[in-house]
Amino acid sequence: MYYRPDNLNDALEVLCVKKLKIAAGCTDLFPATQNDFLGNNILDISGINSLRSINIEKQFRRIGATTTWSDLIKSELPDCYEMLKQCSNQVGSIQIQNSGTIGGNLCNASPAADGVPCLLSLNASIELSSKEKIRILKLEDFIKGS
């Protein structure tokens, strides 16, 4: 089945009962299938607007998982995040920047993940959500598989 919820709660609900591949920009997912049929196991989170945002929260910036590299390049971030914008401008081609997502770059676990070094240097943390709880994890621990 192909699911495309418009809110995070519905997406988390579906993940509780089905084993699904999570998709958004698909810049890694589609090439990884090597033209194989993906089957009926896709959760497309690209329609969840709350995941495609850049928000100011107390003393940090919250960048949603489906935020694209182009979104970051065009955003009005403080000067201390200029490095992130410059790194975003170096990710792949313009086509990848327009569809590739921050969350996909981190979750794919590729050794060539363009965004990881910059986000690590900014001491980034990630938010992991399930129906039961929300965890905040330092990116360095997430990368290690902690």
Name each model-derived stretch.
Residues 1-146:
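C-terminal structural segment of proteins
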